[in-house]
Amino acid sequence: ASACAQPAPKTGSSTPSSINDNDTKAHANYEEKNRQYREIDASLPALAPVWPDRLPSPNGSDSPRGVIVDLDLKGGTWSLGRIPAGRDVRPPEDPVLAAARSIPGTQRLSWEGSNALIATFTEPGPLQRNKLKPAMGFVFISATQHHVVDDDGHVAVPHVPSASATRTWFVLHTPEHPRAIALLMPGMLGTPEGMLELMAKRLMARDIAVLRMVAQPSRFTEHAEFVVPDRESIPALAGHIAQVFGDRTAECAYAAQAAFEHIFKAHPDLASVPRVAIGYSAGAMTLPTVLALEPDAYAAGVIVGGGCHYWLISELSNYATMIDAIVTNWGRTTPTADLRSDLAEAYLAHAPLDSFHTASILKGKPILMVQAKADLAVPTELGDVLWERLGKPERWLREGGHESLFFQHLPKDLDSIVAWIETSAKLRERPVEPKESNQP
């Protein structure tokens, strides 16, 4: 059955604004690409989540799907770098390598490849000294088993399976008397750093602890290219694409779940306060799936600049070339509008962990969407579809595009977002500080 058989009306405005990130030429290019796809039917039934396997963790781990290593925070700041194409990956530092080797089934372990993102903790520079200092920092490591296949399709070493490791870095900020804890998930490549830091500071000022995902899991941006040889290959190829997107999104959920278990052991007081999640851009796209892994654990969620249908976002986004994570190569096939739409529909029918499907699990939960009316990075139309899939929760629409949403509007909205969290997650009142007395 066609995944988008019945066109749905677009609910968001895509009127160009005067902001540079939404100039007329950019919109014309976007509209030309967008016309090559049939619109997504937001009324389709949801697929049940299918969570990919990970190698089981050793006894005593905080997570059934991996291990966690506490890190030397140095000055509490970090740098992020992508692995260049064709560059050999150096093994990580000894404690991380040893922890990964403790996972059963990792006799042959490979690390991240081209375009993957790696974090390194560093001393703060002159412009970083006003950053919040974390209470702790750590990395979650999981491993996925696979077999090396030779040119004839046979398993090369059948008795020694290979495993690929993925890392996700976190820091924790906690006030003296926490009223809640917020998972803060960034956009691609750990951005926008300044707005993430501002949000963390506003939350901390209101006695809300912050578990900050430094960046998406290391393989989230790893380069993968899919070649479409002909129309007949589309169903199988769509399943493969959906598997890659699903695996990367699931890792976000697994890492967040493990991170909470880890910090609850170090800070037991955090286990008894409400938990919320905030996602920016790519973090907003994956937020429904992160919450879908353990929906009862979260009291509320905030989606800033998010959308659904990951493959279509990767095709339409004006950030696609810069990110260079998932590339669809049509080879000698002429990519007609029908072929593109067929692939988009087939992908959705094979992608149970796309937020298009996991959003239905969150219906009835307090969700706030903050969305730009003319977003070309996470297309507004796909944000509209996510809003419908979530059951049309509270939504604040802002003029302009993706950059103006985060750098023009979000700084003004931070206090209102925090107030929304306090109300929606039903946080206890902050204690009234006693007034100073002049009496002896």
Regions of interest found by a model, annotated:
Residues 235-281:
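Gly/Ser-rich "nucleophile elbow"/oxyanion-hole loop immediately N-terminal to the catalytic nucleophile
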